[in-house]
Structures are given as structure tokens and as C-alpha cells.
Amino acid sequence: MERAYEHGMDALALTDHGSANGLSYQLLHAKKMKAEGKNFKPIYGVEAYFVPSVADWRKEYDEAKLDKKRAKTLSDKKNEGSFINDEGSDRSSKRSLSRRRHLVLLAASQKGLDNIFQLISTSYDEEYFYRYPRMDFDLLRKHSEGVICLSACMSGVLAAAYWQHREESDEAVLVAMRELAAEFKDIFGDRFY
């Protein structure tokens, strides 16, 4: 924050991945700066982990778990002379289960900060947590008031559309990005960037 101030900035968003652990330090340092006569605004938020639908993910997870059990059963039968390779239990299926994208959420108001705290807290619940605290469209829809949403970085939601569709065509990339952007616009309105 000091460095930003020294370079002429009067505000800065600092976000942690999946939590708001640094927020208290940001708040305390902003108070210190104010006491020193430095007019500086901390912007509170989180760089969240996002999956489009936790319910859909849960179905995929349950299917992968079942496929793994089937593969084990089939593997045990291998010694009896028959074996079927089950592709559902391969590494790519595991990667898709742990896949998540980044999404930056910033508080535009006290209500927005309260909603960000609620989103973070819920993302750690058993229903949403899988290796990382995750949020989906349904959860964001419930707690979007006062929240600004940014599409984030190269691991962000729009970048994901590029990485997933780049080998199909430029048009496929644009269609996927437009669909995602429309969903976020529906939730956040003009607070999605």
C-alpha cells in the first residue's frame, strides 16, 4: 500500500486466494496511513476459486468414484482372465475434478463486504470444498449485492474458455466467452468486468 501511494495511487485492492486472511493487515495499515495524513483507500476482496456448478461437479465426482470402484473390481478379476480398462478412472478425470478457475470479488460497499465474507465462509463448507474452497453461479447469485466481479487472470473464468476451445476455432472461443460473460452479467450487472 505504501508503494502504491508513493507512485501516486490513492487506492489498491489486495486479495488472497480463497480467503480474506490479509484483510486485517490491510485495514490496520490503512488506519496507520490515515493517521500519517495519507489519503488512501484499501479495497477489500478475495480471489475466489470458481466452478460453474457444484451440483454438476458432485455428479461427476460420484461417477468417478463409482468408476474407480468398478475399475478395482475389474482389476481384481484380471487374474481370472478378463480385464476391461475403465477410462473414467484415468488421470484426466481426476484433473477435471480438481479443476477450478479464479474469479476476483471486490467489495463496493459494506453489504458487498458482508456478502464476500458469506461467500468465503460457505465456500469452505463440505458441499463446496474439494481441495480448495469453491464458489459457483448459484452461490454467487445469492450473495452478489454490493460485489464487483472481475474475470481475473490467465487462470480466470474467461481465460478458461480460451484454453478449452482454442483448438476448435476462434469463433468457438468467442462463443464460450460470451456465454460465460452473459451469465456473470446476469448476476452482477454492470459490476462484472
Predicted segments with their positions:
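Phosphodiester-processing cores and adjacent nucleic acid-binding clamps
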Residues: 1-193
